[in-house]
A protein has these predicted regions:
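Membrane-anchoring hydrophobic helices of lipid-metabolizing enzymes
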Residues: 1-104, 109, 141-146, 152
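Short, contiguous strand/loop micro-motifs
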Residues: 20-21, 77, 130-132, 193-196, ...
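Residues that cap or flank secondary-structure elements
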Residues: 25, 81-82, 136, 157, ...
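Non-catalytic C-terminal accessory region of glycerolipid acyltransferases
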Residues: 51-54, 146, 150, 159-297
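Alpha-helical segments flanking ligand/cofactor-binding loops in enzyme cores
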Residues: 91, 115, 208-209
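Hydrophobic helix-cap positions at the C-terminus of alpha-helices
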Residues: 93, 117-120, 168, 261
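Catalytic core of membrane glycerolipid acyltransferases/transacylases, capturing the structured
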Residues: 96-159, 186-195
């Protein structure tokens, strides 16, 4: 029997075994995880940081089996495990003809958000989707697309999103797209640095530019995991007038809200990502920003 076909109870047994292997034997990215956690929380003792670290690996293995289960779980069973809050605010935006955008970080299980469209009842025609970066392997790329679209959402490659959104607007199609916006940009894509988890952090600003261009109502998606296999996704309105906000204000507000989410329960953040590998000192040494573009000095 494949992993995806096993009941959740059996999946979490597999997850526990994988956690032991990943943490104690393979030691997957242990150095990066430890460094990220201790530098993000200098006020915490080493024992507290190790507790977060162990919790992270346990959640990370759960995330994997929960995501694989998306390929076989029924919509009814999935909805029994997740709760959406703030959907009424999204439907109010759709009622007045305004499209929406959700912005979130790599926290909790972001893959389960593909089920959002199942709870938007007043506008069943609305397009609910996520933006993704295609994988190098066509096989795994197709596998992940099918998995993410199994709950009725659509996947749009990052490079094509603006074209899709313009097309939806020309057809008067209401839509809600999710942007995972806490990745580490390459040097040539750095236009803004922000304080985030005790680091001077380079951040992407492309999501905000698209939201302004499309006049989206922007929602921060707060994630909670009250118990194993249960998630609460709360859509919190950041603004329904993005064009009236100062430049980069949406991005700044997002990172403040994301840090609040992480500090509430740190173990569910993706600490294995080498988030702070690029520094402002290295950037300033080789690059500068001219007329909104990053160029070499």
């Amino acid at each position: 029997m494949c992993i995806r076909d096993r009941p959740y109870r059996a999946l979490y047994v597999i997850s526990d075994i994988a956690n032991l292997v990943l943490y104690h034997i393979v030691r997957y990215r242990r150095d990066i995880v430890r460094r990220n956690i201790t530098s993000a929380f200098p006020e915490k003792s080493l024992e507290e940081c190790i507790s977060i670290e162990r919790g992270f690996y346990k959640w990370f293995c759960d995330y994997f089996v929960e995501t694989v289960k998306l390929m076989s779980v029924s919509r009814q069973e999935l909805l029994s495990r997740i709760e959406f809050r703030g959907i009424d605010k999204i439907e109010e935006c759709f009622d007045r003809g305004q499209t929406c955008a959700g912005i979130l970080g790599h926290y909790g299980n972001w893959e389960l958000l593909s089920a959002t469209g199942l709870v938007i009842k007043k506008h069943p025609e609305a397009v609910i989707g996520l933006i993704y970066h295609p994988l190098r392997s066509q096989l795994f790329d197709r596998l992940f697309i099918n998995m993410r679209q199994s709950m009725g959402g659509v996947c749009v490659p990052k490079k094509d999103i603006l074209r899709y959104l313009v097309s939806f607007r020309s057809q008067n199609l209401m839509n809600l797209f999710g942007y995972i916006a806490d990745q580490a940009p390459r040097y040539r894509n750095i236009h803004l640095w922000l304080p985030f988890l005790n680091h001077d952090t380079p951040v992407f600003t492309g999501a905000e530019r698209i939201m302004r261009k499309m006049n989206n109502a922007v929602f921060y998606i707060d994630v909670e995991r009250p118990e194993r296999g249960k998630y609460i996704y709360t859509f919190k309105l950041m603004t329904d007038k993005p064009g009236e906000m100062p430049e980069f204000e949406i991005t700044k507000k997002f990172f403040v809200m994301l840090e609040q989410t992480i500090r509430r329960e740190p173990r569910f953040y993706l600490w294995s990502h080498n988030r702070w590998k690029r520094t402002r000192e290295e950037f300033d040494k080789e690059f500068k920003i001219e007329n909104g573009h990053v160029v070499r000095k």
